Amino acid sequence: MSLGELLETCRSRRIELWSEAGRLRYRAPQGALDAGLAERLRAEREALLEHLEGGPGWRAEPDLAHQRFPLTPVQAAYVLGRQAAFDYGGNACQLYAEYDWPADTDPARLEAAWNAMVERHPMLRAVIEDNAWQRVLPEVPWQRLTVHACAGLDEAAFQAHLERVRERLDHACAALDQWPVLRPELSIGRDDCVLHCSVDFTLVDYASLQLLLGEWRRRYLDPQWTAEPLEATFRDYVGVEQRRRQSPAWQRDRDWWLARLDALPGRPDLPLRAQPDTRSTRFRHFHARLDEAAWQALGARAGEHGLSAAGVALAAFAETIGRWSQAPAFCLNLTVLNRPPLHPQLAQVLGDFTALSLLAVDSRHGDSFVERARRIGEQMFDDLDHPTFSGVDLLRELARRRGRGADLMPVVFTSGIGSVQRLLGDGEAPRAPRYMISQTPQVWLDCQVTDQFGGLEIGWDVRLGLFPEGQAEAMFDDFVGLLRRLAQSPRAWTDGDATEPVEAPPQALPGSARSIAAGFAERALLTPDATVIHDAAGSYSYRQVAQHASALRRVLEAHGAGRGRRVAVMLPKSAAQLVAVIGILQAGAAYVPVDIRQPPLRRQAILASPEVVAWVCLESDVPNAGCACVAIDRLAADSAWPPPPAAEVAADDLAYVIYTSGSTGTPKGVMLSHAAVSNTLLDINQRYGVDANDRVLGLAELSFDLSVYDFFGATAAGAQVVLPDPARGSDPSHWAELLERHAITLWNSVPAQGQMLIDYLESEPQRHLPGPRCVLWSGDWIPVSLPTRWWRRWPDSALFSLGGATEAAIWSIEQPIRPQHTELASIPYGRALRGQSVEVLDARGRRCPPGVRGEIHIGGVGLALGYAGDPQRTAERFVRHPDGRRLYRTGDLGRYLADGSIEFLGREDDQVKIRGHRIELAELDAALCAHPQVNLAATVVLGETHERSLASFVTLHAPAEAGEDPRTALDTVRQRAAQALRRDWGSEEGIAAAVAALDRACLASLAAWLAGSGLFASATPLDFATLCQRLGIAEARQRLLRHWLRQLEEGGYLRAEGEGWLGCAERPAQSPEDAWTAFAGCAPAALWPAELVAYLRDSAQSLGEQLAGRISPAALMFPQGSARIAEAMYSQGLHAQALHEAMAEAIAAIVERQPQRRWRLLELGAGTAAASRAVIARLAPLVQRGTEVDYLFTDVSSYFLAAARERFADQPWVRFGRFDMNGDLLDQGVAPHSVDILLSSGALNNALDTPALLAGLRELLSADAWLVIQELTREHNEISVSQSLMMENPRDLRDERRQLFVHTGQWLEWLAAQGGDLACGVVPPGSALDLLGYDVLLARCKTDRARLEPAELLAFVEARVPRYMLPAQLRVLERLPVTGNGKIDRKALTGFARQPQADLRHGVAQAPADELESALLALWREVLDNPSLGVEQDFFGAGGDSLLIAQLIARLRERLESARRHPFDRLLRWALSQPTPRGLAERLRSAPEEGRGPALAAARGVAPAQTGMSRAPLAEGAVALDPLVRLVPGEGVPRVLVHEGLGTLLPYRPLLRALGEGRPLLGLAVHDSDAYLAIPAEYLNACLGRRYAEALHGAGLREVDLLGYCSGGLVALETAKSLLQRGVRVRQLDIVSSYRIPYRVDDERLLLFSFAATLGLDTAALGFPAPERLGQAVQAALAQTPERLGAEALAGLPGLADLVALRGRVLQAASGSADAASVERDTLYRLFCHSVRASQAEALEPYVGALRLFVPDAGNPLVPRYAEALETQWRAAALGACGIHEVPGGHFDCLGEALAQSLSKPMPEEASQ
């Protein structure tokens, strides 16, 4: 007996132990301490003393009885769990129970008894303060008992009353800071009396409740009974527990638990709904009972096996959870009654003594229930021997090590077996409740068992909204059924798993026990001259193939081929492959296909098998094989007919060996027998009616088992096989040609190849081809969009999904694909083929329950013989089931659906846990593919164990419809850029002369340096090697020397003769000094500043010293680190300024075309920021007006990056990063498909291979991207004698042509070749800039691609999967990589994902920006006990957890005045969403108390003093629930006002008083502008509706009225839909003048007018025409382009031409001054524009309820026939009744008293249903 068991025995016998002065003391009831136990106590005396003295002793502190004391860890968890900010939170830890009392119960007497207990028990007077402390009130008033007098009700009415009380109390969440917390009620009927107890377990636990009920009954029955005063208190107990945490025992227990921590499993992986409701707060109670006889029988059987009855109940629960858990190892959360014998009276004290203990369970261990129960019991007692380090402590450590979410252990076991009755002793025992339900925060399932009422009471409380329909009931029934079996049957304890009845083993199809080639042979004899196969060379009959195969057979037999031998085949895709395999099989041997593209070492590994006696290949491919090689193309066909019969083989003989990739890196050879494969071939031919009329396209390689069907299944049926040309085997256009040429009827491929064909055909919409009648897809996931796309092309094709494994005869399972399957997350896997079995089994070989994931096992006649030469691997994968069947473990995961079919869930590798959540990658891929622009999606897992994350990749469709002509936009941008080039350049002749003088000066310096070689003095040519030797030219500079020689030759200094050079006799005689003086004299200073001229001269005159290394080229250009020369070269010249301004204007023109779009710019080689300055300055006003720009400034040099960070520090939208254009472009932190504008000034020429660079950059470009490039476009001798000495040698055509630069034409050719759909130069030919040799190049790329922002796609996916499933990386690719077999290459994707996404921000840890950040940082460091944290440190990343963040919030509210203005729960939500000091500071700053301008003040509140960016108007005493605002208190069904386009409740001000009389009035307002704007407009209303419904549901509302005005009506509609899905009744949905705009608004003038009108500004004073005139202009423009109001549609109206000035007037008027409240004003305008864009989304989806539409009688001047338009839209949206009501006023002023009166009239009851 362990020490823990000894203590438990003493507790069970009510023996109290304590230490006193080093001696062991005890107190025991008579007869409880027998001789054996006394001896045991003496033997364990020292251990007991050590245990009892390990913690601090009892310390009574009566003087502090009414002072605050801390919560226990469990209490703190309960309090924190009440916050709805946490998943599975938002509810109390509460029990509601109903007890029968006598019908004649005296309420006054019962009330007196209750108050007597309140006086005796301090915790009945306790409250919780500040969510962190508890306090016992010294005095409380007399507590009145709520009594419902129902004696006048009949039985039915009384039961209805009880139901109403139950509905009100069974999920009550009592206010813990207000006494009384416990408020029992009494219902007295005619014949019944029911006591209602809603008990918050934060103050008293279940055992305390039983003590309370027992004492209450005793006091009621005997009012004179006097209980002994309680000296012990719960407060004193908590003090002991607090001090215990400083004891050696706590440290010892902590060490024990932490040593086990990394090995602890996570929570049970129970199947959940596709979208579990993490905000659900409702529970359902299940109850069952073992009668006393059954319970005694179970206890007796437990005793026979040395187990306790309580331990058996726990083991049975673990067994049940293990049956349903998709991971066999998991932790259960045990609640433990922690009442140590610290004080004799502690057993009578009320309080929450609950402790938690995590019990690790592995359901795989143990061959019988007894063994597993013993193991669990031993583990539990070991755990309970280390109790001082609590389960809450352990959960916090789990969260620290594994991340947020790991601390969720939501499956709880609570046992009161024996313990409750022992605690009650001989006192009054309460009766069993007539009804009971409990709920606990962050708990999914709570199992409670107790024997206190005789028999065993079994209860489960299950959170609703998590588990699939019927699952909780099935799990509960399993648990109860197991307990009943254990009580009834001895075999249930000792037998292994009881297997379910097994159907008769699958039987092979008749006629399948033969060679796989027998069907071909029969067909050859039957129709010898029928065509059997087509390849690139021609067509062949059965006779031809058979005769060639016969010839091959003879040769192979001569080399020893026969039964038991193998012959390898390495041939390209052709008819020769069919000849080879038929010949090999006729010889009785097995064939081994080897892909001709495989690496030599892999081929050698296959060849190493001693059974391989020969190879068949082409003469040109004969390998050095070490065995006989037969060149099939040198064999002549046999002429004999019929050919000799095939060698006799047994059905179980080997037919072929296919090698697949092995997990160890060594290929594994799968050996299939003839009988196994023949059964599949026969089933497929019969199933799909394959006959001689069919043509199958043989896409599969011979080494892929789909080819087995093509060659042996199709040919046996007489069908023809069509093979693609091996040179075009992966070309879908070639497949299309074959479909047309051969009228293919049977398509057999992996899904990716079907996808490739459809992708190609969709790009050729005019091409019409005959389609296959039957399509077989297998080998990989089938994208759910593929069937629909296929049917769109060929609606008559029958589509089938086939599955299985190479180890099981090609296929084992089939699913006909139906249209409804395309709406699922994945195509179902289906049912087994004939002769085979496919089962989903758990780790113990049991059939998984429906919905539970397990491993797919294949059985039946199709199983392989095993793996060639690998008995160990064969034994691992081919296993014996307990019932004796042989099964193949596929490693694939699946689950049974309700109809018994199987759903495929991917490989085990496709399952991952992220922060404790089980994720199926297929579900995420399906959600991504559901987006209409996504073509394919694939997700991979990154990282190990607790650091795992997801990376998703998608490819996109082409745009659904063509936009504007790309040439038009390109020409517009070019014209804007060209205008920026206009300058007073002076005389073009003078510029040309200066350029020529500069060239002469450079050449003169070169010639003078070259003279040192003796070249000009030599009479014979000097070869290149001699020149290099004489001049001392290193190899790295020899290319530059060749360039110089060419330039000197063109300049008349020398001429080439043969392999050498000679000086020209009549070469220019000008000296370098004279030449440079001449240039300086004619060079315009505006183009060549004096400092630049001096630098060029100095560099040209010191070539020898630079080449010798005596002078550094870099030091010349950057003297003493100064950039002044670089500034003179790149920035100061007139040409540099013009070029950079042209680039800036071009980029501005591009951005201004779509100012609402987010623009991502990447500048390469930014260097001195010469171009950057112009571009950033030009973009800054656009950013200020609301355009979102992300500008990434890059260079290879940290020198330039540091300077740029300082220069642009005031532009937060500019980021910085290192980028090496000559490195791997995908390895530098810029994601593919993420750049909208790529700009570069003079840098791309520095690339080693410019065409390759442009090709790589294309991968980074998004759809419809732009290149804006400035480059040198002629040879510049001044560069060749200066900067070229710092440049590397190019490897493109510049090297071949001895050039440093290329002309504009070559640049345009490169751009066109590398994805520039359209490209042009800006500089006019013959202009000054052209003479100087410069151009600005524009290219527009990927105009044929759809555009999709990853953020937009993430928002789309967020509506379909839980947040924990969202990928950490999301990248858009041109195409997904595929393997040789056409499957998605996930290994390659993992490599892509591991390419770094560099942190390209400012990079330096920043100090606190103000006092608020400093204060928050101090709190972060204090709570986390880490002084090194920074302002951007994530709280949870630094080791924080949910309990610590609650402490942080409590301290925050204590210390910061700005935080005390906000309720605890709001601060907690903010901290969870922005868990950094800087992020939380920003949230606090963005909720100011006062506004800044009159218009904005009105927008944000009822009066200017109540404004704030993140808060809607608050009436006096109103409470903000973020985004929910309580405006007016009241009783009854609340009315909820939904904000309009400003995100505010401004328009409702006239209605507040009228609507708020007598009933609650709530509002929904935008609380986080950034979050609102981050939601893509097309999903905004639906996303808001979902979030607002969550807020209303989380606030406990179950019935509401909704009111939405303007765009708020659209949001209200979506909110109503989501509320209905959550079970909340929408009694009235009222829509006021809400209009979905049926066209796109591109003219900002209309937005500005609507914004001003909504704010109530004087639109005429702002310069707008009359609204009617504006409306007429809108309609006139729409008559021309109905789908779009063009960007300049209203520009011709008076006063509206200057959009910039108009915008300035409106925004100034909105803020009340030119600069006040500009940030708030601009944000408000952005909110409004975003809301308008959301109102332009697709047509309204139907709403299944009724609604009322209120139409202003004066209409909307911007919309003709407004009433009719509104009625049409909303009648179509409402499937229920749609009442139309006219109200006075126009759209902008209809919210008045008349509307309030109309709204007050209730909707007819029949319409509201």
Curated annotation (Swiss-Prot):
Pfam families from the UniProt entry: AMP-binding, Condensation, Methyltransf_12, PP-binding, TubC_N
UniProt-listed PROSITE patterns: AMP_BINDING, CARRIER, PHOSPHOPANTETHEINE
Region described as Adenylation: 520-915
Cofactor(s) of this protein: pantetheine 4'-phosphate
Catalytic activity entry: holo-[peptidyl-carrier protein] + L-cysteine + ATP = L-cysteinyl-[peptidyl-carrier protein] + AMP + diphosphate
Residue ranges of domain Carrier in the record: 1407-1488
Positions carrying O-(pantetheine 4'-phosphoryl)serine: S1442
Keyword Ligase: yes
GO CC terms of this entry: cytoplasm
Region feature (Thioesterase): 1584-1797
This enzyme's EC code(s): 6.2.1.69
Condensation/cyclization: annotated segments: 69-490
Keyword Transport appears in the UniProt entry: no
Database matches in PANTHER family: NONRIBOSOMAL PEPTIDE SYNTHETASE, PYOCHELIN SYNTHASE PCHF
The record's note on its domains: Modular protein that contains a condensation/cyclization domain involved in the cyclization of the cysteine, an adenylation domain which activates the cysteine residue into an aminoacyl-AMP ester, a peptidyl carrier protein (PCP2) domain which bears a phosphopantetheinyl arm to attach the activated cysteine and a thioesterase domain (TE) that may release the newly synthesized peptide from the enzyme.
Family affiliation: Belongs to the NRP synthetase family.
Protein task: Involved in the biosynthesis of the siderophore pyochelin. Adenylates L-cysteine and loads it onto its peptidyl carrier domain via a thioester linkage to the phosphopanthetheine moiety. Then forms a peptide bond between the salicyl-thiazolinyl intermediate bound to the second carrier domain of PchE and the cysteine bound to its own peptidyl carrier domain to form the salicyl-thiazolinyl-cysteinyl-S-PCP2 intermediate. It subsequently cyclizes the C-terminal cysteine to form the second thiazoline heterocycle in the salicyl-thiazolinyl-thiazolinyl-S-PCP2 intermediate.
Protein name: Pyochelin synthetase PchF
Annotated organism of origin: Pseudomonas aeruginosa (strain UCBPP-PA14)
